[in-house]
């Protein structure tokens, strides 16, 4: 699903994704990928937070804003300055191809072809997605563009916290013990999705 994203929106996104020294966190290749695969128009969910076109971007930006605020307020130390930007903005990168508009009917053309009619107000899971998963998938997709630190990998992998599968709760706890920013990432995600509702 290619994105229709205005020049001013691209500029705003790129400016937001800059470190205090002006270094861009997002390469041109990464930006092309985000545009081509629908990051800016995808929803964040089918029926919960951010379940509208552009919801993934809004949710991801809010998580990043919360994570940056938590970092400053709590004097969090990250291995790399870019980490809260990458973790916050791309923790749900897995969702770029995870949802689609459901087909509600078809229009038969004169030549016998059928054109689907989509419900543009609703979302459903896309069964055609080849790469499944959540945190793991986001890490795999990001690895095409970044050499991620162990801390970034764990923060993205376990950002769901206790909402992850019960069989992984011990792993989540161990990840938090080794990389405390995993817990802060989960908190930023919960603030965005459950408090702000984005």
Spans of model-derived segments:
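Divalent metal-dependent catalytic cores for phosphoryl transfer on phosphate-bearing substrates
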Residues: 45-47, 52, 58, 70-198
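Helix-hairpin-helix/helix-loop-helix acidic hairpins
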Residues: 64-65
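Non-catalytic interface/linker regions that flank or bridge core catalytic/transmembrane domains
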Residues: 1-42
């Amino acid at each position: 699903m290619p994105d229709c994203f205005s020049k001013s929106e691209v500029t705003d996104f790129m400016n937001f994704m800059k470190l205090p020294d002006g270094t861009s966190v997002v390469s041109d290749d990464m930006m092309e990928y985000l545009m081509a695969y629908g990051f800016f128009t995808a929803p964040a969910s089918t029926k919960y937070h951010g379940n509208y076109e552009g919801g993934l971007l809004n949710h991801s930006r809010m998580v990043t804003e919360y994570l940056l605020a938590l970092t400053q307020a709590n004097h969090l130390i990250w291995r790399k300055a870019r980490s809260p930007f990458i973790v916050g903005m791309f923790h749900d990168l897995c969702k770029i191809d995870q949802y689609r508009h459901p087909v509600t009917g078809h229009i038969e053309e004169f030549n016998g072809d059928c054109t689907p009619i989509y419900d543009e107000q609703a979302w459903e899971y896309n069964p055609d997605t080849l790469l499944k998963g959540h945190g793991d998938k986001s890490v795999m997709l990001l690895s095409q563009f970044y050499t991620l630190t162990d801390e970034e990998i764990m923060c993205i992998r376990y950002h769901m916290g206790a909402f992850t599968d019960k069989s992984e709760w011990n792993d989540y706890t161990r990840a938090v013990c080794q990389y405390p920013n995993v817990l802060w990432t989960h908190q930023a995600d919960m603030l965005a999705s459950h408090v702000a509702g984005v």
